[in-house]
Design a protein with these regions (language model features):
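N-terminal Rossmann-like or analogous alpha/beta NTP/dinucleotide-binding catalytic cores
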Residues: 1-101, 186-200
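Short, conserved loop/turn and helix-capping segments at secondary-structure boundaries
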Residues: 4, 35, 181-188, 222-225, ...
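Glycine- and acidic
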Residues: 22-27, 173-178, 397, 424-429
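Catalytic adenosine-cofactor/nucleotide-binding cores of aminoacyl-tRNA synthetases and other
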Residues: 31, 198-357, 419-451
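Active-site cores that bind ATP or allylic diphosphates and position pyrophosphate for catalysis
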Residues: 76-79, 84-207, 212-219, 227, ...
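Short histidine-centered catalytic/ligand-binding loop motif
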Residues: 177-181, 230, 377, 381
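C-terminal accessory/binding modules appended to enzymatic or scaffolding proteins
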Residues: 362-422
Length: 451
């Protein structure tokens, strides 16, 4: 989720400035490099509107393709005196730190004059003084260079470390703005030193707040539901997801948070992003999604629901789905659902071959002594009544008034008989759509079951 929001920040910045959003896959860690993961990133970006075919989009580029440039940059830093080689092993570094009572690398090889060789890492010579990072979100942030150890650029086997590769790629690709999560802020002074040492002006930095869960802990892949596809598969629309993500740490102008992307893209400013961590509230996301579903035209809503009603997400074979029937019930459920995944269970009684009855609901609905005889009375009058929801409701109201049973109670056995459950779309509209023959058949089956 945090990555998706940060991607949106970058995308909007590119749109506002007529710039380029660059997708770079940092694939130098082979243990975390799988082709399907790259495609998953591309698909997730496309779902939230960051389209690879848009002229403001470039990539994906793969960091591993630029390894030679990374090594060349490291060698130039050595040649200019900004870096030096060190032959200490990690164990030796730890032993020296323990003996000195100070954590980290102590700069032991700074003035030893070592050259490249097997097992020798190249380290950056951190200058004295302070490094100032001017951040679009956090303002001026100062770092005492004395707290930053001489960090590695090349490992002992000659491969580049990520922090060097990242800066070299940014320079090569003419990156002007780096917008990322605040957890990367501690690395920023190191990267800014590298930009300076390589003779280039650092980009505009912007470190945005992290997203947290209900316990106010940073969202975690291990603990929290954080993948976009999980929400997509539950029936969150991309428009609602984008709108909600953009309200986490930033607020649109006006008195409502429900705003379209065009408005967001026009009004968003990095300088207006909040410093505090933002709570990713799943319930609020669902509420946003419900608002977006209600804003759809009927045809848009039906089209959005169809994948859920004609695939294995449905509770019936695809061939039993009838778009015309769903078009009739859709206005009655559009205002009642927050997620598209809720739709199949609300309309299954219209499409299943064998209606499943909620046993607990059935027992409760038929517990009253009047339930069976009054349902029989309804069934008798339904055989000749006009088959529309007004006439059907009038029949039930008349029977209820004659027997001193309120409409709400009298609907219970009828609803369970017709739909199999105690809740659902408006009952009389549902009966009208279900049809006389099927409704009477289900009432007969319920009466037989009730005994």
């Amino acid at each position: 989720m945090g990555g998706a929001r940060t991607a949106l920040y970058n995308w909007i910045l590119a749109l506002q400035s007529n710039g380029i959003f660059v997708l770079r896959i940092e694939d130098t860690d082979e243990s975390r490099n799988e082709p399907q993961w790259t495609q998953g990133i591309i698909d997730a970006l496309a779902w939230i509107g960051i389209d690879g075919s848009d002229p403001h989009f470039e990539g994906p580029y793969f960091q591993s393709a630029y390894a030679a440039a990374h090594v060349a940059a490291a060698e130039s830093l050595f040649a200019s005196g900004h870096a030096y080689y060190c032959d200490l092993t990690s164990e030796q570094i730890q032993e020296r730190a323990k003996a000195a009572g100070k954590p980290g690398y102590d700069g032991y090889s700074r003035d030893r004059g070592l050259t490249a060789g097997p097992g020798r890492a190249l380290r950056f010579r951190v200058p004295p003084g302070t490094t100032v990072v001017n951040d679009e979100v956090r303002g001026r942030v100062e770092f005492d260079n004395a707290t930053i150890e001489d960090f590695a650029l090349l490992r002992g086997n000659g491969t580049p470390v990520f922090i060097l590769a990242n800066v070299v790629d940014d320079i090569t690709m003419n990156i002007t703005h780096v917008v990322r999560a605040e957890e990367h802020l501690p690395n920023t002074p190191k990267q800014q030193m590298l930009w300076d040492a390589l003779g280039h002006t650092a980009p505009v930095w912007a470190h945005v707040p992290v997203l947290v869960n209900e316990q106010r802990k940073k969202l975690s892949k291990r603990r929290d539901k954080v993948a976009l596809e999980q929400y997509r598969d539950e029936g969150v629309t991309p428009e609602a997801m984008v709108n909600y993500l953009m309200t986490l740490g930033w607020a649109p102008t006006g008195d409502t948070e429900i705003v379209d992307f065009a408005t967001i893209a026009k009004d968003f400013r990095l300088s207006s992003v909040n410093h505090s961590s933002a709570f990713f509230d799943i319930k609020k996301l669902s509420a946003f999604n419900g608002e977006y579903l209600r804003k759809m035209t009927l045809e848009q809503f039906v089209s959005a629901c169809e994948p859920w009603l004609t695939s294995d997400k449905a509770l019936w074979p695809a061939e039993r789905f009838d778009r015309g029937i769903f078009l009739r019930i859709a206005p009655h459920i559009q205002t009642r659902v927050a997620l598209l995944s809720e739709v199949p269970a609300m309309v299954d009684f219209l499409f299943v071959a064998d209606l499943a009855i909620d046993a607990a609901a059935f027992e409760k609905a038929f517990a009253a002594e009047w339930a069976r005889p009054l349902l029989r009375a309804m069934r008798e009058q339904f055989t000749t009544a006009d088959w529309n929801h007004e006439a059907l409701k009038a029949v039930v109201e008349t029977i209820g008034a004659a027997n001193d049973v309120k409409l709400g109670k009298l609907q219970a056995p009828l609803r369970v008989a017709a739909t199999g459950r105690s809740v659902g779309p408006p009952l009389f509209e549902s009966l009208e759509i279900l049809g006389r023959d099927e409704s009477l058949r289900r009432i007969d089956a319920a009466l037989l079951r009730a005994g």
